[in-house]
Curated annotation (Swiss-Prot):
Keyword Isomerase recorded: yes
Site positions (Interaction with DNA): W61, W168, R176, R312
Organism listed in the record: Bacillus cereus (strain ATCC 14579 / DSM 31 / CCUG 7414 / JCM 2152 / NBRC 15305 / NCIMB 9373 / NCTC 2599 / NRRL B-3711)
Domain Topo IA-type catalytic: 153-594
HAMAP family per record: Topoisom_3_prok
UniProt protein name: DNA topoisomerase 3
Amino acid sequence: MSKSVVIAEKPSVARDIARVLKCDKKGNGYLEGSKYIVTWALGHLVTLADPESYDVKYKKWNLEDLPMLPERLKLTVIKQTGKQFNAVKSQLLRKDVNEIIVATDAGREGELVARWIIDKVKLNKPIKRLWISSVTDKAIKDGFANLKPGKAYDNLYASAVARSEADWYIGLNATRALTTRFNAQLNCGRVQTPTVAMIASREDEIKNFKAQTYYGIEAQTMEKLKLTWQDANGNSRSFNKEKIDGIVKRLDKQNATVVEIDKKQKKSFSPGLYDLTELQRDANKKFGYSAKETLNIMQKLYEQHKVLTYPRTDSRYISSDIVGTLPERLKACGVGEYRPFAHKVLQKPIKPNKSFVDDSKVSDHHAIIPTEGYVNFSAFTDKERKIYDLVVKRFLAVLFPAFEYEQLTLRTKVGNETFIARGKTILHAGWKEVYENRFEDDDVTDDVKEQLLPHIEKGDTLAVKLIMQTSGQTKAPARFNEATLLSAMENPTKYMDTQNKQLADTLKSTGGLGTVATRADIIDKLFNSFLIEKRGKDIHITSKGRQLLDLVPEELKSPTLTGEWEQKLEAIAKGKLKKEVFISEMKNYTKEIVSEIKSSDKKYKHDNISTKSCPDCGKPMLEVNGKKGKMLVCQDRECGHRKNVSRTTNARCPQCKKKLELRGEGAGQIFACKCGYREKLSTFQERRKKESGNKADKRDVQKYMKQQNKEEEPLNNPFAEALKKLKFD
């Protein structure tokens, strides 16, 4: 009897699919049943070959050998996961296998994971596609009942290959050219370089900003009501101090007369459902989680706990076919503190509306929402619980009615000047009930603060107790943090000085810099390359980042190019552009970049040389700020030696509760805090043992410390090997 091989992206998903398909016979890297063989990748098992596989001369980095432009790029098996590749290959080549089912993540990168394996094996068997947004048993069963022909995703695969090959041609050539020309470990890319340029531009704005003092007037009545002055245009601020002084002097000892009471009933609707970027922004603002950390937590909630849908989505809407599943999802997530809210929604039929249901705004995947799967909070970590809470509350809020309130604006005259006061009466809490009325709109910046207004009629006279001048200073633009940088990458036109409407529309339609699936990795790479650094929550550009922008070709710094390329990749995915045409353009562009770098007469200056010498080659070490602390890195890119000097941990200072920094090596390591607190590692171990009731041994503490320095990386990404060899520092 013939069988079908199912290729999943990860072992955990493979196990779930195998259980549903009753594949319980364990083999070497696969699970088998009567009809199906389920095997798995580990992220990417296959990637584009290194330059040296085309010509041995590319083993050495020489400027004169550039650009490297092989006619066709070859595929190679990633060394670390070669064993699993062979396991998958042996199943694909079985004579009793007549069909392949691609069950990797439903998206461009997932398509690439499976198709590259199939291409490398040189297989010519029919392909079908499983395309699902959650990995619950129901979703898997429904997906297998509605398998799509593999040919329907050929263009998506072509687009994924085009993106990867473009990054190979441009990324590897530009990086080698910069590094060899300027004798420094420099790397650039079509997304990361414009991102660094935006950070630099924001720092320039801050540096050039000159604060101005502005003035206003506030009147206080005997009833402790605060009235705010407004000019004829409704402005409550003026840069003319003399004008404000004159008004204050003129109005002294005058009372206020109520000339108008404006009552308006208003509604505000819940913010939309989460896509990945919006969730990463909120998690950073509320909990300080990095974009990468949030994505990793979401992956666990999706794959391991199966309580949330596919995370790498760029849609904030659900499609109409999902509406019928909402009651089951509400029952599943409506436990514990969410029970009363879910119960309330289920009392009436759910009325879908365009604020959260829109087929035209859902492409590959709908918004992140709860699944119909059972929720076991005791299995969640604290971080998983917090991310789950964000998603469920937003899901419930969208299904609740609007927040309704009556806004009262009191307009008074003091002399011939206008003063106003505002108040709000809540008529119906609506969706804010889910947030216990604590949800605040970040965009509210009105000078006129809402207050509790006494009962007042038009024509009433209010005795003014005090009239005084107020003042403040204009603020410089805020530095980027991870939340605001994600916003900037999603909509870079807001941070660009461009009059080109077509360019702005292109960037908007292509989703900005990077994709929801890649932005977290891009930000992480910028930290690890020491092009940017964190100071507190703020992101600063480093000297290395500044110099890189001065050395790279101008076009690479602008989001324009990325926007145009993303548009073309989208056209390939839709079958409107041939991959070969795009790659030909990329090769020509690579030639231009390399030529420009070669002819540059600029120099790179290391301004972070330490007094330490490299233990491997004896050259000076560079002191850099990594994402998690200070590091020493060898100046020689060929050597690549690096070591940690200090790192920020999750251990908290017993005095001020801030995160402690771990400095030094071995038994001499010491915890240090900005408040001045110091503690030896051995003392910390003893204290932790006591705090845990003498249950923690030295091994537990070492495990805890190891966890602080652990980065949860994807199992493999397509350029892991290549990038490692490039020694991006």
